[in-house]
Amino acid sequence: MMDDKHGRYGACDRCRGQKLRCVGAGKPIPNSSSRLLRNEIPCDRCRRAKVECYSVRPAPRRAASNVKEQMIATQAASERSSSLAYHTSGPVVSPPNSLVTAASKPHPNSLSFNHPRSDAVAAPGGLQTRRQSRDTDSLGDMPSMPHEWMAYLHDHKMDDRQGLGMETPPLIESDLNLSRDPAMDSMHEHNMMMELIHQDHQEEWNSGPPELEAYPDPIVPPNPAPLKARKLTSPDCDDYPYGHTRRSSHTPTQPPEPAGRSCIQELAQFNEMLLRDKCSLEDTSARRGYKDSWLSIGRTLHHCQQFFSILKRIKYSRPDSQLSADRARSQWSSLPEGTSLADGAPTDSPQARRSLARGATPCSSSLARSSSTSSAASTSYLGLSTLLSILFCYTYILQAYEDILTSILHAVTRPTPTIPPTLSGLRIDGFQLDGHHTLQLECLLHVSYNLLEKIENILFGSAGPEELSNPVKYGILGDKLSAGLIDALFEHNETNGLLHCQGKREVAAKRLIREIQAALKQLDL
């Protein structure tokens, strides 16, 4: 320990913060409680290191011009501290003796740290007790300076967080908590608890009816459907009667995509492709001045086959396919033999066939009732866009076939008939069909007729029952009577061409195929 004449009554804060022994200046400090005097006379260690020697907080970078400015700053700080203590109703600062005694108590959670605010220096033996008693006597003899003590406490808090440039040890935090008001702390905790309670209450969903004041527009009434949907789809709980709730699983379960939806998407893509082909063919025909029909035979066959595969998947993926068949079987089994249509003719009479050919809709008969019921049931699951896509694709394919078959029929029935090549490059198990134009045309007609017949059966169902034991199989667009929607596009001016095979309605493409086949039999080429 240093001598009294060459030492200080208390170590400077820089040396005390670094756990170093503070070497005093040449002459002792007459009043160690004065911050200005301790900053005025640095210790030997700080002077050799050429750093500012401070006790409470670092001295300003520029040297003070006079002591009067520093006293004014100290007085202003003391006034702010006194006003703060008055407004917060804090307790009066205890005398220096009690402050030193309270500061000398070790923290219960501390193991090896001494209190940083005590003036005692760690030394062997009983030197620390003698140093503390000497400091206590000197502090008790000095005059009372309340404003400087308030400034000291205020600067003490600022120095712990800024001056030392290090984290505040738990001992200093306990020293700062000595002057707190427990009533204010309890009030602060009470306010925080009330804020948490009010916050939880605001996040809670209001299950009552929505208020009109919450909606700025008085004309549009509030829709409680989104609120109800939010309540029902809450990930926390599900609604149960009697106020019980069940915790739902947070793992999202996505329903598998039905097969019918993928088929409908494929149909939409096929529809877009046909639209592009139609636009390109129209542009090509406008530039060349004629319709390039024969060059589109293979493309038309490909479109027809693809459309048939899509319709077949849609048919077997619909939910009421088996139900419609059972309903149709029960309806046809209940019909007595010789049931009349709207005009009073039996179903197997020529008059009934002519009424079907004219597109009559016998709504008063049980046959029409069963047809309309099955048509509504079968098309209920198809949307409007899907229905229009099916009609457009079918109409486009029929129009392409009509263009191709009409040009072939004109070539076959002219005064000097010729059979054009239709399926060039076709091979049947190594047998080349090139040069055999008649075989090519017969293959084209046979394949096209079968594809069109299958598409027609899927769309409108099979033909009417020849016997009561065979029930009607309805298509995805209804029964065979609905074929008039398509036939009207191609058979405006022809009335005799609609009658074929017990009054069945047929499209113009199938009629052209039959006429070409009849012309080939007459030519014998």
Swiss-Prot record:
Induction behaviour: Expression is induced by the cAMP-dependent protein kinase A signaling pathway.
Listed GO CC annotations: nucleus
Region of interest called Disordered, as start-end residue ranges on this chain: 80-142, 204-260, 327-371
Keywords: DNA-binding, Metal-binding, Nucleus, Transcription, Transcription regulation, Zinc
Protein's UniProt keywords contain Lyase: no
Annotated InterPro entries: Zn2-C6_fun-type_DNA-bd_sf, Zn2Cys6_DnaBD
Gene disruption: observed consequences: Leads to reduced growth and sporulation, but does not affect virulence in infected mice. Impairs the production of isoquinolines.
MF terms (GO), sorted A to Z: DNA binding; DNA-binding transcription factor activity, RNA polymerase II-specific; zinc ion binding
Disulphide bonds in the chain: none
Annotated Polar residues bias: 95-115, 327-337
Known function: Transcription factor that regulates the expression of the gene cluster that mediates the biosynthesis of the isoquinoline alkaloids fumisoquin A, fumisoquin B and fumisoquin C; as well as small amounts of fumipyrrole as a shunt metabolite. The products of the cluster lead to a brown coloration and are important for growth and conidiation.
Protein name listed in UniProt: C6 finger transcription factor fsqA
Organism: Aspergillus fumigatus (strain ATCC MYA-4609 / CBS 101355 / FGSC A1100 / Af293)
Gene: fsqA
